[in-house]
A protein has these predicted regions:
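Juxtamembrane intracellular "pre-TM" segments in multi-pass secondary transporters
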Residues: 2-33
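MFS transmembrane alpha-helix packing/gate-lining sites
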Residues: 77-81, 165, 169
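Helix-to-loop junctions at the C-terminal end of transmembrane segments
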Residues: 81-94, 181
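Extracytoplasmic gate region of multi-pass secondary transporters
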Residues: 28-79, 139, 143, 173-174
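Small-residue (Gly/Pro/Ala) motifs that create kinks and tight helix-helix packing interfaces
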Residues: 53, 85, 173-181
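A membrane-interface helix-boundary motif in multi-pass transporters
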Residues: 179-198
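C-terminal transmembrane helical hairpin of 12-TM major facilitator-type secondary transporters
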Residues: 95-145
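Loop-to-transmembrane helix entry/capping segments in MFS-fold secondary transporters
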Residues: 64-65, 152-162
Length: 198
């Protein structure tokens, strides 16, 4: 219906898809920087959220009934912060700087979760809030950066390829996490349930 409406308005028809569009996109270095940031960023967040409640119980001694509350701060924060950071990007630009700040925050968060310090619930909460800032900051600058390096007629293909790369990461990283946990982090079995030493 939308295409018919656009045709009725007399707008130029879109150019048909061509295989050389893919070649153009995958030979663009900027595309690969954004695609790799996307796969690394989302692979460091989404699989982490899957294991975060168990991390809260095992490492930070959070009551299992409340263990999902701390990781639950992440999407709540994203609802509030992502539009604010998007507005900031629209006003000042500086997409590469914003993405770099968010990526450094993400590295800091995972480093703090990995170090054996301050194994208390309030520390985990603060670190999760910092992760919420990173989780909002990077995408609000990353997705609008794609049209700056890819022509409009190839944007659909570029976004599809970015999601294709991202899904490879989202498939592989949980397997890697599970392998690491089973190989190096197994604790004792308690009440018939395997525990892990984070």
């Amino acid at each position: 219906k939308l295409d018919a409406s656009l045709d009725a308005q007399g707008l130029e028809p879109e150019e048909p898809f061509r295989m050389k569009d893919i070649v153009y996109i995958v030979t663009n270095k900027g595309f690969w920087l954004i695609a790799l940031l996307c796969v690394l960023f989302y692979s460091a967040v989404f699989p982490f959220i899957k294991y975060a409640a168990d991390l809260m119980v095992q490492k930070y001694n959070v009551d299992p009934k409340l263990a999902g509350t701390i990781p639950g701060l992440l999407p709540i924060g994203a609802i509030i912060l992502t539009p604010l950071f998007g507005s900031l990007y629209d006003r000042i630009g500086k997409g590469a700087t914003l993405m770099t700040i968010g990526a450094v925050m993400l590295i800091f968060v995972h480093t703090m979760f990995a170090l054996p310090i301050l194994n208390v619930w309030w520390f985990a909460t603060i670190i999760m809030i910092v992760l919420g800032f990173a989780f909002s900051l990077v995408p609000s600058a990353m997705w609008p950066s794609v049209p700056k390096i890819i022509p409009e007629k190839q944007l659909g293909t570029a976004y599809a390829l970015i999601f294709w790369v991202q899904n490879w990461g989202l498939m592989g990283v949980p397997l890697l996490i599970g392998w690491v946990l089973n190989s190096y982090c197994k604790g004792p079995v308690v009440d018939g349930a395997q525990t892990y030493d984070y």
